[in-house]
Design a protein with these regions (language model features):
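A residue-level signal for beta-strand positions that form part of recognition/binding surfaces
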Residues: 6, 52, 84, 125
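Short, surface-exposed glycine/acidic/tryptophan-bearing loops
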Residues: 62-85
């Protein structure tokens, strides 16, 4: 099933953990609608500008979230009008891509995760979410400190 010109449902629901553990990671029709909006509003414009988008984590069922230690309230669950994914574009600076996404798409939340700076432009990945009800335009940086994940606002 196509979610946008260049994105398929299979691409957004694939999960090695779900496959290994036999977890059903198939979304409901309402969740598919939310994933479609994420693809149309956020991922497709990124693809049109930057080329191939490598989605490392898209939809996660509640059971999959529990299995990987994530929250069942995560936007990756594609509930409550929202959907999220983690991605990168190989060979492109993640900060440069994230800055473009923030300024050029109707993003709800954007997190530049574990990026180590211009000297390591391919470090980390980008988390992006879309919410049909409320676009917070929140841009954060995720980093580790004292063994814990912390977040701070990204200045643009």
């Amino acid at each position: 099933m196509k979610l946008s010109k260049n994105f398929s449902l299979d691409e957004l629901i694939k999960s090695q953990v779900a496959e290994r553990k036999g977890i059903n990671n198939n979304p409901s029709p309402a969740q598919i609608d939310n994933l479609k909006l994420l693809c149309e509003k956020v991922l497709q414009p990124i693809r049109d500008k930057w080329g191939v988008v490598n989605v490392s984590s898209g939809f996660r069922s509640a059971e999959l979230c529990i299995a990987i230690g994530s929250s069942v309230n995560s936007q990756h669950c594609a509930d409550n009008g929202s959907a999220a994914c983690d991605f990168e574009i190989f060979g492109k600076d993640n900060e440069e891509v994230a800055d473009w996404v923030f300024h050029n798409t109707p993003i709800d939340q954007l997190i530049l995760e574990f990026y180590k700076g211009k000297d390591q432009p391919n470090s980390g990945w980008i988390h992006a979410s879309y919410n049909r009800n409320n676009q917070r335009k929140q841009y954060l940086i995720a980093y580790r400190e004292d063994g814990k994940v912390k977040y701070k606002p990204k200045l643009t």
